[in-house]
């Protein structure tokens, strides 16, 4: 009985792949996406270089400086966008892992419930055997007392009837022999019942030990899974910190670029025609940036909707098993991941707002340059 039960318990674990393999597959997909974005950025740089080759040397030098700065800004924006997408995808992977762990937890709870019912049945059977054993002991004691009384009466009758009833005495002796034979048979049956009770008790203890070992193994697997989730959460926190540092560096570069642009405005009157052409080109670049920002906003809205759907599904599943401590721990972890994601989203929105402010300032400068031109 125990061997097929263990095979049934181990069967679903062999079918489902471990969460580490899924994380490796997701990381490979992310690396492929990063390589594709890098190739696209290189193509854009090549097109920009081809456009610069058709200009004069002075225009190339100045436009190359501005173009390099604008490309650095666009590269930083692309890097930050790619990092935010990676964080979103890893959050989704963790949510999927949490759902799988909850399903495994439900399966393990059902198995433990079945094992508890089986142990309860064994205990009930053991109690019935113990009650039967006590009844047999009482019957044996009563039979011994009756046998002693009969022997005493037999002795009295034998003494009284030794001289009177020899034939009756022989009959009584035959009855006594029959009773002794019956007593011996009953004692043999009692000994066999005792041995059976002892064997059943040993089997029940062995099964209880096996159940306890299975419970300890399942507890070890649950602790390992929680440690893996904690390590993944720590890596996500580190990546979030790196993204925050990169955003701060990008803001510093933006501030330095704005200072350089203000210094450059003092020499604008000497280079009116060239600056008009530059303003037109920069207007095109700004339109491209606005299109990229709109695409980022659409992707962020889609990711938010997917996250809301996943959270609603997770909450519906968590309501059914809210009494379990494991689900509460997972809920706390998901809340921490959600909080980190909200912070990263707020920082990305602040960075987007800052970039929009810089773009509006550049537009104002372009308008002023157009007014200065004849």
From Swiss-Prot:
Residues 19-32 have a biased composition (Basic and acidic residues). It is found in: Cytoplasm; Nucleus. Residues 20-351 form a coiled coil. The modification Phosphothreonine is found at residue 16. It comes from the Eukaryota. The keyword Ion transport does not apply. Disulfide bonds: none annotated. InterPro entries: CCDC89-like. GO terms for cellular component: cytoplasm; nucleus. Keywords: Coiled coil, Cytoplasm, Nucleus, Phosphoprotein. Residues 1-40 are annotated as: Disordered. PANTHER family: COILED-COIL DOMAIN-CONTAINING PROTEIN 89. Belongs to the CCDC89 family. Interacts with HEY1. This is Coiled-coil domain-containing protein 89. It comes from Homo sapiens.
């Amino acid at each position: 009985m125990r061997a097929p039960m263990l095979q049934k318990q181990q069967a679903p674990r062999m079918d489902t792949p471990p969460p580490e393999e899924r994380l490796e597959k997701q990381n490979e997909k992310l690396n492929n996406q990063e390589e594709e974005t890098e190739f696209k950025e290189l193509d854009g740089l090549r097109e920009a270089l081809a456009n610069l080759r058709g200009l004069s040397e002075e225009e190339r030098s100045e436009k190359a400086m501005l173009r390099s700065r604008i490309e650095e800004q666009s590269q930083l924006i692309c890097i930050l966008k790619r990092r935010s997408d990676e964080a979103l995808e890893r959050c989704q992977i963790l949510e999927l892992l949490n759902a799988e762990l909850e399903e495994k937890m439900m399966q393990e709870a059902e198995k433990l419930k079945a094992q508890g019912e089986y142990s309860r049945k064994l205990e009930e059977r053991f109690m019935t055997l113990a009650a039967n054993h006590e009844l047999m002991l009482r019957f044996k004691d009563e039979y011994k007392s009756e046998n002693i009384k009969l022997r005493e009466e037999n002795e009295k009758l034998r003494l009284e009837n030794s001289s009177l009833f020899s034939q009756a005495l022989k009959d009584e002796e035959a009855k006594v022999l029959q009773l002794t034979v019956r007593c011996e048979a009953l004692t043999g049956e009692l000994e066999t019942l005792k041995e059976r009770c002892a064997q059943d008790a040993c089997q029940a203890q062995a099964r209880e030990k096996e159940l306890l070992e299975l419970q300890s193994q399942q507890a070890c697997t649950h602790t390992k899974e929680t440690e893996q989730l904690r390590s993944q959460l720590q890596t996500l926190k580190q990546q979030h910190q790196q993204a925050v540092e990169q955003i701060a560096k990008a803001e510093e570069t933006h501030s330095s670029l704005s200072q350089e642009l203000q210094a450059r405005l003092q020499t604008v009157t000497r280079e009116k025609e060239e600056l008009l052409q530059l303003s037109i080109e920069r207007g095109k670049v700004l339109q491209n940036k606005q299109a990229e920002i709109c695409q980022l906003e659409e992707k962020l809205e889609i990711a938010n909707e997917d996250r809301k759907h996943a959270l609603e599904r997770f909450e519906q599943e968590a309501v059914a098993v809210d009494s379990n401590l494991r689900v509460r721990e997972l809920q706390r972890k998901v809340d921490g991941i959600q909080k980190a994601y909200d912070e990263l989203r707020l920082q990305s929105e602040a960075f987007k707002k800052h970039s929009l402010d810089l773009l509006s300032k550049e537009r104002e400068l372009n308008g002023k340059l157009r007014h200065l031109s004849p």
